[in-house]
C-alpha cells in the first residue's frame, strides 16, 4: 500500500501542468564564429560563464548573462575517445592566482585517449580528467592544462561517470550502468568517495573499492518497480541540496527526454517528461544562481535550456 500510494503521488508530480517550464536561452548555430556547434556533452558553470564541452574534448565558453560566446578551445585531454560526457568544477585551484578552480571531466568511453600519451592497449580508460583552465591577461579562458587523471576500476560496471555537489564539492560520486542503457536487469549504481585533495605531484590518482565511503542504487531510492534512469539512456548527473538529478533520453518518442530525481535520503523521487515541449537530447546540468542550466543536442546544433530551480524543487514530491 505504501508503494502504491507513493507511485500515484509520483505520477501526479509528472503531470505536464505541474512541471516547471524550461526556457531556451542559447542556440550555438546563431554564432558563426564557433568552430564546433554539435555533439555537446558535459557542462560546468563558474560565475556567469558556462563551459560547454563537446564530444572529443572541445570547449565553448558562453556568457550566460548575454547568451554570447566568450571563447573556444580544445581541452588538454582532447582526443577521439574523450566523450567529455559530464563536467563540474571542484573547489581547489592549481595556483591561488588562477581565476577558475579545477575542472573535472568524465571521459566515459572505454578506449584510451592516445592523444594524451596513452597506448592503444593501455587499460586506463573511463577516466576523470582534471584540467587547469588557462586565461589571458584579461582573464578570458583560452585553453587548459591536464594536471591529473583519476582512475577507478570497479569489478562489475558497464560505465563510469562522475559528479559532485555543485555548491559544496566535498564528496566525489562515481555512477553508471551495471548492465547497459535500457537493458534488462540494469541498475544505476552510485558510489561516494572523499573528494581527493589535489596535489600537483600526483598526476595519476588511483581510487580503489577500499576508498568507497557509501554505495547506493538510484532505483533503491524509489518504490519497487518505479520507472527510473535504469530504464532509460543515461546522460549526465547533477547533485544539489541532497537531490540527485539525472537527465536521460534523446528527446524522441522511443527515448523520451526525462529528468529523473531522487533525494539521497529516499524521501523524494520521481521524474518529469519534457519530450513534448523540449524534444532534444539533454546532456548535463549545473546551477547558475537560481536556474539550472542544461546543454542539449538537436539534429543540427547544440542548444542551452534553463530551468527555474526553486519551482523544480517545489514541484517535486
Model-derived segments and spans:
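Beta-strand-rich domains and repeat architectures in extracellular enzymes and scaffolds
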Residues: 28-57, 235, 245
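Structural motif
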Residues: 57-61, 111-132, 171, 180-195, ...
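Surface-exposed loop and turn segments in beta-propeller and other repeat-based domains
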Residues: 25-34, 73-85, 130-158, 197-230, ...
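Blade-loop segments of beta-propeller domains
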Residues: 67-111
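Structural signature of eukaryotic scaffold interfaces centered on beta-propeller domains
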Residues: 36-46, 83-102, 153-174, 230-240, ...
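Loop/turn-rich, solvent-exposed surfaces of beta-rich toroidal or solenoidal domains
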Residues: 215-264
Amino acid at each position: 500500500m505504501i508503494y502504491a500510494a507513493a507511485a500515484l503521488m509520483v505520477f501526479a508530480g509528472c503531470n505536464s501542468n505541474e512541471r516547471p517550464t524550461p526556457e531556451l536561452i542559447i542556440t550555438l548555430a546563431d554564432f558563426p564564429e564557433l568552430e564546433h556547434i554539435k555533439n555537446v556533452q558535459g557542462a560546468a558553470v563558474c560565475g556567469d560563464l558556462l563551459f560547454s564541452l563537446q564530444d572529443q574534448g572541445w570547449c565553448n565558453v558562453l556568457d550566460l548573462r548575454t547568451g554570447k560566446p566568450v571563447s573556444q578551445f580544445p581541452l588538454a585531454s582532447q582526443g577521439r575517445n574523450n566523450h567529455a560526457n559530464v563536467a563540474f568544477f571542484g573547489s581547489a585551484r592549481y595556483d591561488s592566482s588562477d581565476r577558475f578552480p579545477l575542472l573535472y571531466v568524465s571521459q566515459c568511453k572505454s578506449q584510451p585517449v592516445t592523444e594524451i600519451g596513452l597506448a592503444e592497449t593501455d587499460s586506463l580508460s573511463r577516466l576523470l580528467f582534471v584540467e587547469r583552465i588557462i586565461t589571458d591577461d584579461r582573464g578570458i579562458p583560452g585553453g587548459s592544462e591536464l594536471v591529473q587523471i583519476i582512475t577507478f576500476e570497479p569489478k562489475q560496471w558497464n560505465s563510469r561517470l562522475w559528479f559532485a555537489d555543485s555548491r559544496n564539492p566535498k564528496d566525489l560520486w562515481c555512477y553508471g550502468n551495471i548492465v547497459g542503457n535500457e537493458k534488462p536487469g540494469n541498475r544505476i549504481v552510485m558510489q561516494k568517495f572523499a573528494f581527493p585533495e589535489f596535489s600537483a605531484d600526483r598526476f595519476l590518482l588511483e581510487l580503489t573499492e577500499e576508498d568507497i565511503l557509501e554505495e547506493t542504487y538510484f532505483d533503491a531510492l524509489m518504490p519497487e518497480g518505479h520507472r527510473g534512469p535504469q530504464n532509460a539512456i543515461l546522460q549526465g548527473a547533477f547533485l544539489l541540496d541532497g537531490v540527485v538529478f539525472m537527465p536521460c533520453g534523446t528527446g524522441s518518442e522511443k527515448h523520451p527526454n526525462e529528468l529523473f530525481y531522487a533525494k539521497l535520503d529516499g524521501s523524494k523521487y520521481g521524474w518529469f517528461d519534457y519530450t513534448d515541449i523540449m524534444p532534444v537530447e539533454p546532456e548535463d546540468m549545473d546551477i547558475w544562481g537560481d536556474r539550472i542550466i542544461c546543454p542539449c543536442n538537436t539534429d543540427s546544433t547544440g542548444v542551452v535550456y534553463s530551468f527555474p530551480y526553486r519551482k523544480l524543487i517545489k514541484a517535486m514530491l
